[in-house]
Amino acid sequence: MQTTIQQRSGASAWQQFCEWVTSTDNRLYVGWFGVLMIPTLLAATTCFIVAFIAAPPVDIDGIREPVAGSLLYGNNIISGAVVPSSNAIGLHFYPIWEAASLDEWLYNGGPFQLVIFHFLIGIYAYMGREWELSYRLGMRPWICIAYSAPVAAASAVFLVYPFGQGSFSDAMPLGISGTFNYMLVFQAEHNILMHPFHMLGVAGVFGGSLFSAMHGSLVTSSLVRETTESESQNYGYKFGQEEETYNIVAAHGYFGRLIFQYASFNNSRSLHFFLAAWPVVGIWFTALGVSTMAFNLNGFNFNQSILDSQGRVLNTWADILNRAGLGMEVMHERNAHNFPLDLAAAESAPVALQAPAIG
């Protein structure tokens, strides 16, 4: 019988903790960015779920007209949202301890700030964790670069846009219909559909979907035949097998004949770089567009650009968009004291011919 005696490690508890955090042998890599990511995302997720279910109405416009967003106050999954913090709070940081009571904090939309700030810190840390794991494994850092696109988009709608507009009440609500409401109001106030950076983002998202579907279907179809002509190719493979089944030469030949030769990649790395770069660059541009429109550098205005020989306006698609935007804007601003300036821009009639003497 043999007895094995293992010498106790002389490492301190802190050193053991550091080794565990940075170990790539863990089932899920933690990393130093993970130490920040885990608690912040847990806090954001917990607060979001509780607020979505049970938060009381929020005075989003700061005019004592609370808007209910939670399920217990009559909403469903589609209409429910975590309502942004009040316009009365503006850009002030509004943690729980800044409110006189918990009821006041809830009424002014404090949970929204708690969720978005923890969420943003969490996704920034997740991006850093992607780089950290790549570094530990000796990989190149492009995974976190690709992830920076949705991070930039989230930062644009939750942080940059409220900064530019002067209030967190202008941020995107955390819900399905709230997202659509944000998009409609954004079009009304900034004409985003006529902004080139938004157009690049649309090309990036839809083009990325198209290229992804084309690539996946082409790879799935380009099998190395392991069977005879008289039986199904599928008999030559087991799902999930380790051996290579895909022939890039065959795929290149097929696609080159389907479109034309130079539309097809014969280099796998070039192909996958293109598949990654196309949507990422498109979403970068959209985030940049939202960030510039946050400061009212809006989309192109081609309203009433075409006139006939008599000076009458010939409406174009730009004029149709403008009319739709005006309608969305007056529905959005329910309180009359904040009437949209572009609708109130008619010539003002004097109410007094002479200013009264003062004193």
Swiss-Prot record:
Subunit and interaction comment: PSII is composed of 1 copy each of membrane proteins PsbA, PsbB, PsbC, PsbD, PsbE, PsbF, PsbH, PsbI, PsbJ, PsbK, PsbL, PsbM, PsbT, PsbX, PsbY, PsbZ, Psb30/Ycf12, peripheral proteins PsbO, CyanoQ (PsbQ), PsbU, PsbV and a large number of cofactors. It forms dimeric complexes.
GO molecular-function terms, A-Z: chlorophyll binding; electron transporter, transferring electrons within the cyclic electron transport pathway of photosynthesis activity; iron ion binding; oxidoreductase activity, acting on diphenols and related substances as donors, oxygen as acceptor; oxygen evolving activity
Membrane-related topology note: Multi-pass membrane protein
Misc remark: Cyanobacteria usually contain more than 2 copies of the psbA gene. 2 of the reaction center chlorophylls (ChlD1 and ChlD2) are entirely coordinated by water.
Keyword Transferase (UniProt): no
Cofactor, free-text remark: The D1/D2 heterodimer binds P680, chlorophylls that are the primary electron donor of PSII, and subsequent electron acceptors. It shares a non-heme iron and each subunit binds pheophytin, quinone, additional chlorophylls, carotenoids and lipids. D1 provides most of the ligands for the Mn4-Ca-O5 cluster of the oxygen-evolving complex (OEC). There is also a Cl(-1) ion associated with D1 and D2, which is required for oxygen evolution. The PSII complex binds additional chlorophylls, carotenoids and specific lipids.
Gene: psbA1
Species of provenance: Synechococcus sp. (strain RCC307)
Manganese listed as a keyword: yes
Source taxonomy: Bacteria, Bacillati, Cyanobacteriota, Cyanophyceae, Synechococcales
Binding-site residues, chlorophyll a ChlzD1: H118
Residues that bind Fe cation: H215, H272
UniProt record, GO biological process: photosynthetic electron transport in photosystem II; response to herbicide
Tree of life domain: Bacteria
Residues that hold pheophytin a according to the record: Y126
Name this polypeptide is given: Photosystem II protein D1 1
